[in-house]
Amino acid sequence: MKRIVLLRLGHRPERDKRITTHVGLTARMLGAEGMLLASDDSGIVQSLEDVVRRWGGNFYIKNNVSFKQEIRNWKEGGGKVCHLSMYGVNLPDLADELKKCDKLMIVVGAEKVPPEIYQLADWNVAVGSQPHSEVAAVAITMDRIAEGEPLEKEFPGAELTIVPAERGKHVIENAGE
């Protein structure tokens, strides 16, 4: 089974709470096992842990990590690092290679990314050549490299489950799961 973890760089607690939360939610929904936050924001941790508690799965978040140390540890453990931006090799040209990777760290920045990221990454991947959202970059990339259909992923241990319906909201509360 493919292991994917997201490394979030440049999060500014006063400005990026919502977008960083959405980056984590998107990564979780599309199959990442966790998110490493290279900043200190316990509110993000609390929000994502609450989602996992209510909606299930085993997604984790580590707060205030050293991005250099996390990348080093990941690579020493046999993993590869994919940095998403507007610059680099076009995603469609690398998607097949990324799909073959069993252990992948996806790096996504907020503000200006430290220049060494471009050297530390195994791949610098352009998700389009126009300004875009980090959420979009994560969603497009993870969908392109997914095993199976990521939108059909099940999340064990959920307190709540959405039942597909043509109209309206149908949410069930799972007893003791």
From Swiss-Prot:
This is tRNA (cytidine(56)-2'-O)-methyltransferase. InterPro entries: Alpha/beta_knot_MTases (IPR029028), tRNA_m1G_MTases_N (IPR029026), tRNA_mtfrase_aTrm56 (IPR002845). NCBIfam families: PRK03958.1. One of its GO terms (molecular function) is tRNA (cytidine(56)-2'-O)-methyltransferase activity. Coiled coil: none annotated. SUPFAM superfamilies: alpha/beta knot. Homodimer. Belongs to the aTrm56 family. GO terms for biological process: tRNA nucleoside ribose methylation. It catalyses: cytidine(56) in tRNA + S-adenosyl-L-methionine = 2'-O-methylcytidine(56) in tRNA + S-adenosyl-L-homocysteine + H(+). Keywords: Cytoplasm, Methyltransferase, S-adenosyl-L-methionine, Transferase, tRNA processing. Its main location: cytoplasm. S-adenosyl-L-methionine binds at residues 84, 109-113. Specifically catalyzes the AdoMet-dependent 2'-O-ribose methylation of cytidine at position 56 in tRNAs. Its EC number is 2.1.1.206. It is found in: Cytoplasm. HAMAP family: tRNA_methyltr_aTrm56. The keyword Thylakoid does not apply. One of its GO terms (cellular component) is cytoplasm.
